Amino acid sequence: MPSIVPHYSENNINIAKETEYHERLYEEHNKVSGLLSSKTTDIYDYSKQNIVVSSNVSAGSVDIQSGKDINVTGSNVVADNDVSVKADGNLNIESTEEKSESEHIKSVKKSGLLSGGGLGFTIGKEKQKDQYANQNVEQVGSTVGSVKGSVNLYADKAAQIKGSNVVAGKDINITGENVSIENSNSVYNAQEKHEFKRTGLSVSVGGAYVDVVNNAANSVKHAADVEDKRLGALVAVKGYKDADKAIKNIKGNGGGKVNENLSINVSLGTTKSKSESNSTTTVANASEVKAGGDVNVTSTKKDINITGSNVEGKDVTFNAKDNLNITASKNTNKTEQSSKSSSASVGASLELGKGPSYSISGSMSKGEVSANGTTYNESNVTANKDLSFASGKDANIKGGNLSGEKVTGNVGNDLNIESKQDSNSYKENNKSAGASIGLGSNKAISGSASVGKIDSNYKSVTDQSGIYAGKEGFDIRVEVNTDLKGGIISSEAEKDKNKISTGTLTYEDIQNKADYKAGSIGINVDTSKNAKHKDAGVTPNIGVGAKDDAESTITFFCHRT
């Protein structure tokens, strides 16, 4: 490793990543044909990924200077001793995107004998298709660091650290017209889609005696599957006794003749369903500025912006020419789901000893779900000893914390402290309807319809924004107004060590809220002779509704704890 890497250019200096491209494709087609049925399976798997390969500058010491811009993108500049990076233009230390995509499709088609066994079978066609897809954009950050020395970052124009790390064994000094230490965002998209359709002719033999035979057969099969022989024998004996009891009950109820307890059922029907799901998740990746010694951040003409990131050192000093903004980043999630299904059938049944009966039936259902959530990631500025901040204009702490054993602040205009509320909403709507008409020996009309709904909302402060002083207290001077919205200025020190001077003081509480509403309503129609009294004719079926809400308050504080 060289002892020092000096580099000077009158033009831009770019320390950039390379990208590896990986791609994979798998396809399968398989068809199996039997005497009475066939099955075709198609599989499609595809994925691709762009993998970041970082550039690395590593030496005993590093000194980089540019007459224009310096850009460190998805790469690393590290040294045992001091690292100095100076740009006469802009200085950007930032993350880069690493993209990946995948898609999986499986389709299964069946025809002929779809199911059999017992005393029935179905002949027809069936198709099922499942699809999964993902598109991800992740961030790979840069690192500028010194193991035993200091890191000095200077820009005549803007200095930006985005989704990256600056680390030093000693001090970190960052200077620019405008200084930003902010998060980057990774985005994850996922989709699912499922489809099913089945059409066929079903034939079955039913009746009380048939049920006994089927139950006995199932008991024998269960007994054969049991590993313990004694337990298997007991299962078989129980099955025999249950069958004998069922036959006696049938005879006792006047069903002594076998032909009076047999029926032949034939139906032609179709059923189909479809469901989809789409989700997008955004995850914030914090920048980290951490020093074993002091951290000094200075903007010479404009603002200092800390967004969803962390700054830590022995003593931490912010000196903003204009505004000091310490704000939160946020993670978001959005999910949309939908589903629908329908079925229809025409059937005929002949029960020996009675006349034929016919039936027509159909049903449908539809559902939708929408969910959205936002969570905030506070910026944290931590001084193990003294924390000092100064702004020529406003100091805005909105989704952030400043903490130190002693906190000193000088604000040229307003000091605004505001806590952020995480939020979540969930909405669900469901509809369904069905009807059946019986003709012949089993005349009846029945039907039902229902509508259901869920609506849930939530807002709450998870982390309270503010200024936290240790046993040395705080000394804060604000020229115009101090405004607290669910904010806090707190200290562990005695009262005489805590001082705050402001032109005016305004404050506002933040209400945490949670509410939940759910309800359903339906109607039933049943004209069958066996309909229960409560459902005879046309009756409403009112679902049990639910409603609840809760509130709490985040109050501003300015006190000694």
Label the predicted regions.
Residues 1-561:
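Binding/recognition "hotspot" determinant
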